[in-house]
Protein backbone atom coordinates (compact mmCIF):
# COMPACT_ATOMS: atom_id res chain seq x y z
CA UNK A 1 0.00 0.00 0.00
CA UNK A 2 3.04 2.29 0.05
CA UNK A 3 3.16 5.23 2.40
CA UNK A 4 -0.53 5.95 2.82
CA UNK A 5 -2.27 5.21 6.11
CA UNK A 6 -4.30 2.05 6.22
CA UNK A 7 -8.02 2.66 6.43
CA UNK A 8 -8.76 -0.72 8.02
CA UNK A 9 -7.04 -1.49 11.31
CA UNK A 10 -6.23 -5.04 12.41
CA UNK A 11 -9.55 -5.49 14.21
CA UNK A 12 -11.52 -4.40 11.14
CA UNK A 13 -9.44 -6.67 8.95
CA UNK A 14 -10.20 -9.57 11.28
CA UNK A 15 -13.95 -8.82 11.16
CA UNK A 16 -13.81 -8.54 7.38
CA UNK A 17 -12.06 -11.88 7.06
CA UNK A 18 -14.16 -13.79 9.60
CA UNK A 19 -17.62 -12.28 9.17
CA UNK A 20 -17.65 -11.56 5.43
CA UNK A 21 -14.90 -13.11 3.33
CA UNK A 22 -15.20 -16.51 5.04
CA UNK A 23 -18.55 -16.79 3.21
CA UNK A 24 -17.15 -16.12 -0.26
CA UNK A 25 -17.69 -18.90 -2.76
CA UNK A 26 -16.79 -17.99 -6.35
CA UNK A 27 -14.49 -15.18 -7.47
CA UNK A 28 -15.89 -11.65 -7.65
CA UNK A 29 -14.54 -8.94 -9.94
CA UNK A 30 -14.54 -5.37 -8.67
CA UNK A 31 -14.51 -3.32 -11.86
CA UNK A 32 -13.35 0.14 -10.91
CA UNK A 33 -13.50 3.28 -13.06
CA UNK A 34 -10.85 5.76 -12.01
CA UNK A 35 -10.48 9.28 -13.41
CA UNK A 36 -7.67 11.69 -14.17
CA UNK A 37 -9.98 14.64 -13.63
CA UNK A 38 -8.65 16.68 -10.68
CA UNK A 39 -12.25 17.31 -9.57
CA UNK A 40 -12.59 13.57 -8.83
CA UNK A 41 -11.70 14.12 -5.19
CA UNK A 42 -12.70 10.62 -4.04
CA UNK A 43 -11.18 8.54 -6.83
CA UNK A 44 -8.01 7.72 -4.88
CA UNK A 45 -9.93 6.92 -1.71
CA UNK A 46 -12.24 4.45 -3.45
CA UNK A 47 -9.26 2.73 -5.03
CA UNK A 48 -7.62 2.41 -1.61
CA UNK A 49 -10.79 0.94 -0.07
CA UNK A 50 -11.02 -1.65 -2.87
CA UNK A 51 -7.34 -2.54 -2.54
CA UNK A 52 -7.56 -2.97 1.22
CA UNK A 53 -10.68 -5.15 1.20
CA UNK A 54 -9.23 -7.39 -1.53
CA UNK A 55 -5.88 -7.86 0.22
CA UNK A 56 -4.67 -11.42 -0.59
CA UNK A 57 -4.06 -11.97 3.14
CA UNK A 58 -7.82 -11.66 3.65
CA UNK A 59 -9.14 -13.50 0.58
CA UNK A 60 -8.08 -14.88 -2.78
CA UNK A 61 -11.60 -14.50 -4.19
CA UNK A 62 -11.55 -10.80 -5.12
CA UNK A 63 -10.05 -9.35 -8.25
CA UNK A 64 -9.82 -5.62 -8.96
CA UNK A 65 -9.90 -4.55 -12.59
CA UNK A 66 -9.21 -0.87 -13.06
CA UNK A 67 -10.34 1.19 -16.04
CA UNK A 68 -9.98 4.83 -16.86
CA UNK A 69 -13.13 6.92 -17.23
CA UNK A 70 -11.59 9.22 -19.84
CA UNK A 71 -9.78 6.60 -21.92
CA UNK A 72 -11.84 3.41 -21.76
CA UNK A 73 -14.80 5.00 -23.47
CA UNK A 74 -16.22 1.97 -25.28
CA UNK A 75 -16.37 -0.14 -22.14
CA UNK A 76 -17.67 2.75 -20.10
CA UNK A 77 -20.55 3.19 -22.55
CA UNK A 78 -21.23 -0.53 -22.76
CA UNK A 79 -21.54 -0.74 -18.97
CA UNK A 80 -23.44 2.55 -18.76
CA UNK A 81 -20.97 4.14 -16.37
CA UNK A 82 -21.92 7.81 -16.05
CA UNK A 83 -19.39 9.17 -13.54
CA UNK A 84 -16.20 8.29 -11.69
CA UNK A 85 -15.42 6.89 -9.23
CA UNK A 86 -17.66 3.94 -10.06
CA UNK A 87 -17.39 0.32 -8.94
CA UNK A 88 -19.21 -2.57 -10.58
CA UNK A 89 -19.51 -5.82 -8.67
CA UNK A 90 -19.44 -8.79 -11.04
CA UNK A 91 -19.99 -12.45 -10.19
CA UNK A 92 -23.16 -14.53 -10.10
CA UNK A 93 -25.38 -11.49 -10.71
CA UNK A 94 -27.27 -11.46 -14.01
CA UNK A 95 -27.85 -7.70 -14.12
CA UNK A 96 -25.46 -4.82 -13.46
CA UNK A 97 -24.66 -3.83 -9.88
CA UNK A 98 -22.98 -0.43 -9.64
CA UNK A 99 -21.82 1.79 -6.82
CA UNK A 100 -20.95 5.42 -7.54
CA UNK A 101 -18.81 7.23 -4.99
CA UNK A 102 -17.33 6.09 -1.69
CA UNK A 103 -18.63 2.88 -0.07
CA UNK A 104 -18.12 4.17 3.47
CA UNK A 105 -20.06 4.79 6.68
CA UNK A 106 -23.38 2.94 6.82
CA UNK A 107 -22.87 1.86 3.20
CA UNK A 108 -19.59 0.02 3.89
CA UNK A 109 -20.99 -3.16 5.53
CA UNK A 110 -23.76 -3.23 2.91
CA UNK A 111 -21.16 -3.05 0.13
CA UNK A 112 -19.31 -6.01 1.67
CA UNK A 113 -22.59 -7.91 2.03
CA UNK A 114 -23.33 -7.33 -1.67
CA UNK A 115 -19.96 -8.80 -2.62
CA UNK A 116 -20.83 -11.90 -0.58
CA UNK A 117 -24.21 -12.27 -2.34
CA UNK A 118 -22.61 -11.85 -5.75
CA UNK A 119 -20.07 -14.53 -4.81
CA UNK A 120 -22.58 -17.07 -3.47
CA UNK A 121 -25.58 -16.28 -5.67
CA UNK A 122 -27.84 -16.12 -2.60
CA UNK A 123 -30.79 -13.79 -3.02
CA UNK A 124 -32.73 -12.60 0.02
CA UNK A 125 -36.19 -11.96 -1.40
CA UNK A 126 -39.60 -13.62 -1.01
CA UNK A 127 -40.20 -16.41 -3.55
CA UNK A 128 -43.11 -14.67 -5.28
CA UNK A 129 -41.01 -11.53 -5.76
CA UNK A 130 -38.14 -13.60 -7.18
CA UNK A 131 -40.53 -15.05 -9.77
CA UNK A 132 -41.84 -11.61 -10.71
CA UNK A 133 -38.37 -10.11 -11.02
CA UNK A 134 -37.13 -13.02 -13.13
CA UNK A 135 -40.14 -12.57 -15.41
CA UNK A 136 -39.45 -8.91 -16.28
CA UNK A 137 -38.81 -8.56 -20.01
CA UNK A 138 -38.04 -4.86 -20.38
CA UNK A 139 -34.96 -2.89 -19.30
CA UNK A 140 -35.13 -1.52 -15.76
CA UNK A 141 -32.76 1.07 -14.29
CA UNK A 142 -32.95 1.64 -10.54
CA UNK A 143 -31.05 4.55 -9.01
CA UNK A 144 -30.85 4.76 -5.22
CA UNK A 145 -29.40 8.02 -3.89
CA UNK A 146 -27.69 7.70 -0.52
CA UNK A 147 -25.29 9.30 1.93
CA UNK A 148 -22.76 7.58 4.19
CA UNK A 149 -24.66 8.61 7.34
CA UNK A 150 -28.15 7.44 6.35
CA UNK A 151 -29.36 4.49 8.47
CA UNK A 152 -32.13 3.33 6.11
CA UNK A 153 -30.28 3.69 2.81
CA UNK A 154 -28.36 0.38 2.84
CA UNK A 155 -31.59 -1.62 3.04
CA UNK A 156 -32.95 0.09 -0.07
CA UNK A 157 -29.67 -0.37 -1.95
CA UNK A 158 -29.64 -4.03 -0.92
CA UNK A 159 -33.16 -4.64 -2.26
CA UNK A 160 -32.36 -3.02 -5.61
CA UNK A 161 -29.14 -5.03 -5.88
CA UNK A 162 -31.05 -8.26 -5.15
CA UNK A 163 -33.37 -7.43 -8.06
CA UNK A 164 -30.33 -6.99 -10.32
CA UNK A 165 -28.97 -10.36 -9.15
CA UNK A 166 -31.93 -12.05 -10.81
CA UNK A 167 -32.38 -10.49 -14.23
CA UNK A 168 -29.93 -9.34 -16.89
CA UNK A 169 -32.30 -6.54 -17.92
CA UNK A 170 -32.00 -4.82 -14.54
CA UNK A 171 -29.26 -2.39 -13.60
CA UNK A 172 -29.18 -1.20 -10.00
CA UNK A 173 -27.10 1.82 -9.07
CA UNK A 174 -26.30 3.28 -5.68
CA UNK A 175 -25.21 6.93 -5.78
CA UNK A 176 -23.30 8.10 -2.71
CA UNK A 177 -23.84 11.80 -3.21
CA UNK A 178 -20.93 13.48 -1.39
CA UNK A 179 -18.87 13.50 -4.59
CA UNK A 180 -21.76 14.27 -6.96
CA UNK A 181 -23.51 17.52 -5.98
CA UNK A 182 -24.47 17.99 -9.64
CA UNK A 183 -26.30 14.66 -9.69
CA UNK A 184 -28.07 15.50 -6.42
CA UNK A 185 -29.40 18.73 -7.89
CA UNK A 186 -30.21 17.13 -11.26
CA UNK A 187 -32.48 14.61 -9.51
CA UNK A 188 -33.72 17.02 -6.85
CA UNK A 189 -32.49 14.89 -3.95
CA UNK A 190 -33.42 16.54 -0.65
CA UNK A 191 -33.91 13.45 1.49
CA UNK A 192 -32.32 10.01 1.25
CA UNK A 193 -32.80 7.33 0.24
CA UNK A 194 -34.40 8.65 -2.92
CA UNK A 195 -35.21 6.10 -5.61
CA UNK A 196 -35.71 6.73 -9.34
CA UNK A 197 -36.87 3.94 -11.67
CA UNK A 198 -36.31 4.34 -15.43
CA UNK A 199 -35.96 8.11 -14.99
CA UNK A 200 -39.73 8.14 -14.63
CA UNK A 201 -41.08 6.99 -11.26
CA UNK A 202 -39.52 8.34 -8.07
CA UNK A 203 -40.06 8.45 -4.32
CA UNK A 204 -38.25 9.04 -1.04
CA UNK A 205 -37.74 6.42 1.64
CA UNK A 206 -36.72 2.79 2.03
CA UNK A 207 -39.50 0.46 0.89
CA UNK A 208 -40.06 -3.31 0.91
CA UNK A 209 -39.44 -5.40 -2.24
CA UNK A 210 -43.18 -5.61 -2.98
CA UNK A 211 -43.37 -1.82 -3.24
CA UNK A 212 -40.29 -1.63 -5.47
CA UNK A 213 -41.84 -4.26 -7.74
CA UNK A 214 -45.06 -2.26 -7.97
CA UNK A 215 -43.13 0.88 -8.87
CA UNK A 216 -41.16 -0.98 -11.56
CA UNK A 217 -44.45 -2.13 -13.11
CA UNK A 218 -45.65 1.48 -12.99
CA UNK A 219 -42.47 2.67 -14.71
CA UNK A 220 -42.89 0.06 -17.46
CA UNK A 221 -46.50 0.98 -18.22
Q: Predicted segment positions?
A:
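N-terminal leader/targeting and pre-domain segments
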Residues: 2-29, 109-137
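Local sequence-structure signature of Cys/Sec-based thiol-disulfide redox active-site neighborhoods
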Residues: 11-58, 133-168
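Thiol-based oxidoreductase modules, predominantly thioredoxin-like and allied folds used
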Residues: 35, 59-72, 168-184
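Structured core of small recognition/catalytic domains
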Residues: 153-221
Amino acid sequence: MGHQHRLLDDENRRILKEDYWSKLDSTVKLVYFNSEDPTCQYCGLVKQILEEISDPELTDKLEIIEYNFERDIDLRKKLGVLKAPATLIQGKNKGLIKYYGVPAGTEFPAFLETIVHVSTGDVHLPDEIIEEVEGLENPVNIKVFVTTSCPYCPRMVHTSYMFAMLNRRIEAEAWELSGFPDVASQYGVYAVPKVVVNEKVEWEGAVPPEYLMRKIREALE
